[in-house]
Amino acid sequence: MSIENLVEEIGKLTLTEAAALVKALEEKFGVSAAPVAVAAGVAAPAGDVAAVEEQTEFTVVLVAAGESKINVIKVVRSITGLGLKEAKDLVDGAPKNVKEAISKDEAEKIAKELKDAGASVEVK
């Protein structure tokens, strides 16, 4: 298989499948897909940076499934696009991240869905 064919096939993946591929590659090769930080030419004073920085990315963490585990699994599947087994494994392995690097509004919406299903949820 040529690199061009491989790129074409990867381009056909859904966003969820692509994220799973990245995670599998990170685990297999012991690397991270996070961008490498580049040193800035002129550093701003630390006080200014702290005042400007506001959290823009949030993570929804499933703390516990609660009593209605089946309902929580259904919600996790709809949120993540995972299969039944993967969603069940995520719920059984709580505390686990359900969604990462999302907006505050999306995090609150997902947390509400999970809480309505009976789960204990944390937004970080």
UniProtKB/Swiss-Prot annotation:
The keyword Transferase does not apply. The keyword RNA-binding does not apply. Coiled coil: none annotated. One of its GO terms (molecular function) is mRNA binding. InterPro entries: Ribosomal_bL12, Ribosomal_bL12_C, Ribosomal_bL12_C/ClpS-like, Ribosomal_bL12_oligo, Ribosomal_bL12_oligo_N_sf. Keywords: Ribonucleoprotein, Ribosomal protein. It comes from the Bacteria. GO terms for biological process: translation. Pfam families: Ribosomal_L12, Ribosomal_L12_N. One of its GO terms (cellular component) is cytosolic large ribosomal subunit. NCBIfam families: L12 (TIGR00855). Forms part of the ribosomal stalk which helps the ribosome interact with GTP-bound translation factors. Is thus essential for accurate translation. Belongs to the bacterial ribosomal protein bL12 family. Homodimer. Part of the ribosomal stalk of the 50S ribosomal subunit. Forms a multimeric L10(L12)X complex, where L10 forms an elongated spine to which 2 to 4 L12 dimers bind in a sequential fashion. Binds GTP-bound translation factors. This is Large ribosomal subunit protein bL12. It comes from Chlorobium chlorochromatii (strain CaD3). The lineage of its organism: Bacteria, Pseudomonadati, Chlorobiota, Chlorobiia, Chlorobiales.
